[in-house]
Amino acid sequence: MSLLVQVISLVVISVVVIIIPPCGAALGRIKA
């Protein structure tokens, strides 16, 4: 069970790291 949680956490972190920077840059450009 804990292994499953670790795998899910790793996937979520990977997705966030991949998706968040472009979104942040886009929001920064829009606000600027």
From Swiss-Prot:
Keywords of the record: Amino-acid biosynthesis, Branched-chain amino acid biosynthesis, Leader peptide
GO biological process: amino acid biosynthetic process; branched-chain amino acid biosynthetic process
Keyword Cell division: no
InterPro entries the record matches: IlvGEDA_leader (IPR012567)
Pfam families noted in UniProt: IlvGEDA_leader (PF08046)
Keyword RNA-binding included in the entry's annotation: no
Name of the protein: ilv operon leader peptide
The organism of origin for this protein: Edwardsiella tarda
